[in-house]
C-alpha cells in the first residue's frame, strides 16, 4: 500500500529474537525503520537495536504482540522504541476478534498511525486538506473494545499461568537431548 518492503534480519539461536549483529548489513538508503519482534514473551536486545537505529536515524517499531507484561531492564515491551504494536487477534494474550493498539513516544508517528487507520484523514500534526495519505478503516468496534476491557483484569493471572506452564514444560524437556531451553525469564528481566 505504501511500497514498504520488509527486509529480514537473522535471529539469535539462543533467544529466537532479532540478532542485532545482523541488522547493519541490511540497512540501505531506503531503510526507514527497524521492527524487532519480542517473541514468546522474550524481549529483543533493545539497547543494541536502539543504538543501531540512532546511528542510522531510523525509527524503532516494536512488535510486542506476544510480549504483554514482559520487561526489558525494568521497562515494559512496547515502550522501548518509537512505537510499540500489540495485537488483539484471537491467538494473542488479549483476544478481541481482531484489531490492535499502538503505543509510542513520538506524537508525529502516533498521529500518522491515527491518520492511516482512519482512512488517511488528517489528524494532529498530520495536516492537509481532506485526506493526507492512503489509509484504511481499521477502527475497532465498540463491542470488541468491551470484550477486550473485560480481559484486562485477568491478564496478570493468565500471564503468570503461562510462565508456570513454560517452566513446567522446560523442566520436563530438560532430560531430552534434542531439546534445550531457549532462555529463562531471569536472563532478560522478563516478568509476567
Regions found by a protein language model. Name each.
Residues 14-96, 101-103, 108:
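Active-site phosphate-binding strand-loop segment of PLP-dependent enzymes
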Residues 3:
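Structured binding elements
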Residues 21, 25, 33-37, 42, ...:
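PLP-dependent aminotransferase class I/II
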Residues 8-12:
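Short beta->alpha connector loops at strand-helix junctions that form conserved
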Amino acid at each position: 500500500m505504501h511500497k514498504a518492503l520488509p527486509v529480514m534480519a537473522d535471529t539469535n539461536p539462543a533467544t529466537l529474537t532479532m540478532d542485532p549483529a545482523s541488522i547493519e548489513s541490511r540497512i540501505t538508503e531506503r531503510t526507514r525503520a527497524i521492527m524487532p519482534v519480542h517473541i514468546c514473551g522474550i524481549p529483543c536486545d533493545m539497547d543494541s537495536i536502539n543504538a543501531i537505529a540512532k546511528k542510522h536515524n531510523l525509527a524503532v517499531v516494536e512488535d510486542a504482540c506476544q510480549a504483554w507484561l514482559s520487561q526489558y531492564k525494568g521497562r515494559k515491551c512496547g515502550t522501548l522504541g518509537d512505537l510499540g504494536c500489540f495485537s488483539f487477534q484471537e491467538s494473542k494474550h488479549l483476544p478481541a476478534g481482531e484489531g490492535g493498539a499502538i503505543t509510542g513516544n513520538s506524537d508525529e508517528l502516533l498521529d500518522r498511525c491515527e491518520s492511516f487507520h482512519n482512512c488517511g484523514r488528517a489528524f494532529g500534526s498530520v495536516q492537509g486538506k481532506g485526506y493526507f495519505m492512503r489509509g484504511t478503516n481499521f477502527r475497532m468496534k465498540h463491542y470488541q473494545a468491551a470484550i477486550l476491557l473485560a480481559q484486562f483484569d485477568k491478564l496478570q493471572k493468565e500471564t503468570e499461568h503461562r510462565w508456570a506452564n513454560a517452566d513446567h514444560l522446560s523442566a520436563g524437556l530438560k532430560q531430552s537431548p534434542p531439546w534445550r531451553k531457549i532462555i529463562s525469564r531471569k536472563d532478560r528481566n522478563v516478568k509476567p
